[in-house]
Amino acid sequence: MKLHIVAVGHKMPGWIATGFDEYAKRMPPELRIELREVKPELRSGSRTADSVMAAERQRIEAALPKNARVVALDERGRDWTTMQLAQALPAWQQDGRDVAFVIGGADGLDPQLKSRAELLLRVSSLTLPHGMVRVLLAEQLYRAWSITQNHPYHRA
C-alpha cells in the first residue's frame, strides 16, 4: 500500500520539502509516502471561490490514484488522535488499496470532492499554512507507523 499526499500548491519553501522528505524517507518500503502536487487555480477578481475550488477539484481528481481510499483534510472533519490513525493504518493495509490524503488550496476543498471522500479528517483546530500541513501529516503517518511497530520514536 502506498500513502499519497495530494496537495494543491507548489513552490513551497525549502524547509517544507526538507521536513516532508525527512519523514517520508523514514517510512518502510511497504508504506511509502508519495507527494503529488497540484497546481493551484489562478485567482482573479472575476473568479468566485466556488469556481476556483471546482477547477482545483478537477486537477485533484486527475492526480488521485485509481481506487484509492480518499481522506480529505478539512477544518470540519473528524478529530483523530495519533492512536486512532495508528489503528487505521493496519486496517487500511489489509484492505490493500492505496490511501490518498487530500490537502486543498487557499479556499479549501470543493464540496463534491469532500462528499466523495471516505473520511473527512481535521489535522488541527488551528489554522496552518498548507505547506506545513504536508510536514505535519508526514510526521503523523510516520509516528502512527512507529506505534504499530513498537518503535521507540513514539514515547507516549
Curated annotation (Swiss-Prot):
Name of a matching Pfam family: SPOUT_MTase
A GO CC term assigned to this protein in UniProt: cytoplasm
Binding site residues for S-adenosyl-L-methionine: 73, 104, 123-128
Protein keywords: Cytoplasm, Methyltransferase, rRNA processing, S-adenosyl-L-methionine, Transferase
Cited InterPro entries: Alpha/beta_knot_MTases, RlmH-like, tRNA_m1G_MTases_N
GO MF annotation list: rRNA (pseudouridine-N3-)-methyltransferase activity
Main location as per UniProt: cytoplasm
EC number: 2.1.1.177
Superkingdom field: Bacteria
Protein location: Cytoplasm
Catalytic reaction(s) noted: pseudouridine(1915) in 23S rRNA + S-adenosyl-L-methionine = N(3)-methylpseudouridine(1915) in 23S rRNA + S-adenosyl-L-homocysteine + H(+)
Disulphide bonds in the chain: none
Family assignment from sequence similarity: Belongs to the RNA methyltransferase RlmH family.
NCBIfam families given in the database record: PRK00103.1-4, tRNA_RlmH_YbeA
PANTHER family for the chain: METHYLTRANSFERASE, RIBOSOMAL RNA LARGE SUBUNIT METHYLTRANSFERASE H
Quaternary context: Homodimer.
Biological function: Specifically methylates the pseudouridine at position 1915 (m3Psi1915) in 23S rRNA.
Protein name listed in UniProt: Ribosomal RNA large subunit methyltransferase H
Taxonomic lineage from the root: Bacteria, Pseudomonadati, Pseudomonadota, Betaproteobacteria, Burkholderiales
